[in-house]
A protein has these predicted regions:
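Second RecA-like catalytic domain
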Residues: 1-5, 13, 55-195
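Conserved segment of the helicase C-terminal RecA-like domain
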Residues: 3, 9-61, 75-79
Length: 195
């Protein structure tokens, strides 16, 4: 790579424990991430990094990125740790320990999904969920769909729920994009529209 154009932005996953959702928001990256981008150009020869922000903006950024384990939904991590018998996630010696509230939230979510018993043991569904490399909510949906004989349809829906909204609306072509998207509209259900 000879040249890098750095916007200073990236889509960063953040979990909101209040709503129980993870969203990818365009956010400012840390100084360390900016330096990493700069380091990508010119490794094998001369390179150029153009930053689309000023020095003052760079200096106002956080020095390092908050570790993902401190900003993510921990339900999947907890499910895998229990499945692999790695011990109590609340006592695990993480390099950057997650907040205790996030661990409690992960356990609560797994109990609600039927993956754990009240005393934190894996259920039969929990063992199946741990085998699927997905958010536990999506793996639970797939297991339920299998039981209803709708595996194919449920996998399509789970895949659609796992990504950002695929409907792109370029600012200068919003009207045209809306017309095209209307072809796939189903007034009864967003899920039917996805299928």
């Amino acid at each position: 790579i000879r040249a890098v154009v750095d916007t200073g932005l990236a889509r960063i996953a953040r979990y909101n424990p209040r709503t129980g959702t993870t969203s990818l928001r365009v956010s400012r990256i840390s100084q360390a991430s900016c330096e990493q981008r700069r380091g990508r150009c010119g490794r094998t020869g001369p390179g150029l990094c153009v930053r689309l922000y000023g020095e003052e903006d760079f200096q106002s950024r956080e020095p390092f990125t908050v570790p993902e384990i401190q900003r993510a939904n921990l339900a999947e991590v907890i499910l895998q740790m229990i499945s692999l018998r790695l011990g109590d996630p609340g006592r695990f010696p993480f390099i950057d320990p997650p907040p205790a509230a996030a661990i409690r939230d992960g356990y609560r979510s797994l109990r609600e999904l039927g993956a754990l018993t009240a005393n934190q043991r894996l259920t039969a569904n929990g063992r199946l969920m741990a085998r699927l490399p997905l958010d536990p909510r999506l793996s639970r949906i797939i297991i339920e769909g299998m039981g209803l004989g709708a595996t194919r349809e449920i996998i399509v829906l789970a895949a659609a729920l796992a990504i950002q909204d695929p409907r792109v609306r370029p600012p200068d072509k919003e009207h045209k994009a809306d017309e095209v998207h209307r072809q796939f509209l189903d007034r009864k259900s967003d899920f039917l529209a996805l299928l």
